[in-house]
């Protein structure tokens, strides 16, 4: 394998040793190991995601083929347990901040969207006794604020699998963006509070919510529109009713189901509101993608640090791949889907135009941000 076509190599060019050291110091971790360093643990988990290794032992067997030093599997297992996972989480945030400077798609919405959802990773209950889930399973949950404009996660909160989505969602709000959420995050009091806090939102309503004093909004009818009705009302029963009047848009999805969403956006068309909510598919695709292609369901360790270090590293791998794809795509006229790019990148079989485009994209990044990016691809 060409040593210049690995995720660790790309990350090393984007994030300096000094930046990693600053993160480690910020969480109070001192890396005293000479045989297997913090940087090497990060590279191990990136390679494990990239090549879907099955365990620490598997990684120890094949790691030297990918540029890692020779080590016993117990060495990396101990390191993963020892390193605070907040380091990997902060590293993810740093890489996201670097990668989203140049990558943005225009979705023609009034403000950027912030899609919030969660995904759960489960194993046998004896593997993670600190994270009980249901029945014979244990599990951890990653709550994600996802940006469709950047095709990247923006924020991540980790919890055990039984933690409800609603309360955690409070940590993922952002008044500069439109919050897009499913029914799990719906709560009448929360909507009233969002109006007072000027937090824009498009949230799917629960099916049993009573609609009080409906007043239709004027709109141009269109036979091609999926919107069924557009009105304002108060939400809930007399015992628990919203103090604010909210806008409700009911539209029909591709499967013929009526979807009811509530919003405080009054200067956007009902069709735009429906389009905003349907951007939720992007975070669901993201979750499926990392689980299928970045080894997320295969947890190597049993401690919080080991588990979350691996999961945050998988997210880092996705961010690096997505950024590299988007930047290279700008440099070439040859069409290639994201998944096709990833498969060919992993196998070292990218078309020549894409290799040239990658080199040009990395050189451009180096010129802008002063990082040396030669010998890649």
Swiss-Prot record:
GO terms for biological process: DNA transposition. One of its GO terms (molecular function) is transposase activity. Keywords: DNA recombination, DNA-binding, Transposable element, Transposition. The keyword Coiled coil does not apply. Disulfide bonds: none annotated. It comes from the Bacteria. Coiled coil: none annotated. The keyword Mitochondrion does not apply. InterPro entries: RNaseH-like_sf, Transpos_IS4, Transposase_11. Belongs to the transposase 11 family. This is Probable transposase for insertion sequence element IS5377. The lineage of its organism: Bacteria, Bacillati, Bacillota, Bacilli, Bacillales.
